[in-house]
Amino acid sequence: CCIARQICEGCICCI
């Protein structure tokens, strides 16, 4: 898991 963000279902690599 890269970063936990609400925008991405739980824990996903958002770039």
Curated annotation (Swiss-Prot):
It comes from the Eukaryota. One of its GO terms (cellular component) is extracellular region. Disulfide bonds join C1-C13, C2-C11, C8-C14. Expressed by the venom duct. It is found in: Secreted. Coiled coil: none annotated. Keywords: Disulfide bond, Secreted. Belongs to the conotoxin M superfamily. Alpha-conotoxins act on postsynaptic membranes, they bind to the nicotinic acetylcholine receptors (nAChR) and thus inhibit them. The cysteine framework is III (CC-C-C-CC). This is Alpha-conotoxin-like Sm3.2.
